[in-house]
Amino acid sequence: MLNDLYHMLDPVAISAGPITIYWYGLAYVVGALLTAVVMYRTQRRWGFDITVDDLTSVVVGVVFGLIIGARLFYVIFYGDGYYWAHPLEIFATNEGGMSFHGGLVGGIIGGVLVCRMYKLDAWTIADLAVIGAPLALCLGRCANFVNGELWGKPTDLPWGVIFGGTAGDMPRHPSQLYEAFLEGIVLFCILQVLSRKKPLLPQGTFMGVFVMGYGIVRFLIEFVRVPDAQLGYLLGGVITMGQLLSLPLVIAGLALIIFARRRNQPQRIYLAA
């Protein structure tokens, strides 16, 4: 059934004359909007009142930082020298090649810069952002599935999908959907439950849970996901680049949770004048 569904899907969502809109691009836009809505509703539930203009500025800053960071990390860590020989290809984002780890770093930098401009507390803003971010991750992974990219290893399970092309004609794990469910829906539910705890959890807690949760899921999913062809397995064939980049996230996330608990700084939207 899942295999039949995949072959019914088209990477192009809308095509009208010279205008072509892909599901992958829509995933970014809708994901950003959903994250903004969750941020706004959560901060209202927490008793705060961020202005729509300030929230919009934060989201725009994060999205720009995310896209730049995601692309640069892919070029540096996954390009295997290709982009140094073809520098103009760095800007060909329509051909794919984005890294979550770079997107996380770039998004944080973009968000912090905007927070400084508008005197927003970056810790609380980051916590609010990651509460809704799993929805964007879920949509992004679903778009990966529609595009037939980042597929898994061969499997004889009934939900295996024949992606064709370079993936061949054998059924494979739909690893994109595994990630959509675990790092998307499951992580979103966990963060939603935590966001409703009283009293509010201290600044940095949600960011720590998100980073650690993603790192754990990504590290485990890599066992059933085919590594990037240009890199394969690293360190003697025991680990993938995705796992190598995810291990620090698990450690950093756990450290951030411990730090947040010891710091015990209450949530706030705006910095004191």
Describe the predicted segments one by one.
Residues 1-273:
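Hydrophobic, membrane-interfacing alpha helices
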